[in-house]
């Protein structure tokens, strides 16, 4: 079973403490009834994506290729697009962000965006949702506070 030690992990349906993860999309859930409710909404289109992502443990031979891919990405020219470790920590400690992430609708939007094929189109659609815009603004306010004040 996947580790559910994250302090912010809650059941995607009822927001209780989860015990399990959906084998398709990996969202946490706490019981069979919650899984059944989630399963109705869990997209069958997401299954191939998750199967590609779900791989053997990090110790396998394939992970060595993944490690070099990550290293290549980290050494890419897109340094200005990267969030600093301190800002990542600030995101993780934000109570406002945590409370937004408890919303099942926002979680489903993020899962759809993560698993979708046309991310640019999905991002445009998500940015039409006031809840997602509030989430994005909260993240940007934490990561780029000086730009938020200037606007």
Swiss-Prot record:
Thyroid receptor interacting proteins (TRIPs) specifically interact with the ligand binding domain of the thyroid receptor (TR). Requires the presence of thyroid hormone for its interaction. Interacts with NUFIP1. Interacts (via HIT-type zinc finger) with the RUVBL1/RUVBL2 complex in the presence of ADP. It comes from the Eukaryota. Residues 43-81 are annotated as: Disordered. Keywords: Cytoplasm, Metal-binding, Nucleus, Phosphoprotein, Zinc, Zinc-finger. PROSITE patterns: ZF_HIT. SUPFAM superfamilies: HIT/MYND zinc finger-like. The keyword Phosphoprotein applies. Zn(2+) 1 binds at residues 11, 14, 30, 34. It comes from Mus musculus (Mouse). A zinc finger (HIT-type) spans 11-42. Expressed in the cerebellum. It is found in: Cytoplasm; Nucleus. InterPro entries: BCD1 (IPR051639), Znf_HIT (IPR007529), ZNHIT3_C (IPR048371). This is Zinc finger HIT domain-containing protein 3. Residues 63-81 have a biased composition (Acidic residues). One of its GO terms (cellular component) is cytoplasm. Residues 43-53 have a biased composition (Basic and acidic residues). The modification Phosphoserine is found at residue 76.
């Amino acid at each position: 079973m996947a580790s559910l030690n994250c302090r912010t992990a809650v059941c995607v349906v009822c927001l209780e403490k989860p015990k399990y993860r959906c084998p398709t999309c990996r969202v946490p859930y706490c019981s069979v009834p919650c899984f059944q409710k989630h399963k109705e909404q869990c997209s069958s289109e997401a299954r191939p994506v998750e199967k590609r992502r779900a791989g053997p443990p990090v110790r396998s031979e394939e992970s060595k290729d993944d490690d070099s891919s990550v290293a290549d990405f980290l050494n890419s020219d897109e340094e200005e697009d990267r969030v600093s470790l301190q800002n990542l920590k600030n995101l993780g400690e934000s109570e406002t962000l945590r409370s937004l992430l408890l919303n099942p609708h926002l979680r489903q939007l993020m899962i759809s965006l993560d698993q979708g094929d046309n991310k640019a189109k999905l991002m445009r659609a998500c940015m039409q949702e006031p809840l997602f815009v509030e989430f994005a603004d909260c993240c940007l306010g934490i990561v780029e506070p000086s730009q938020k004040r200037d606007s």
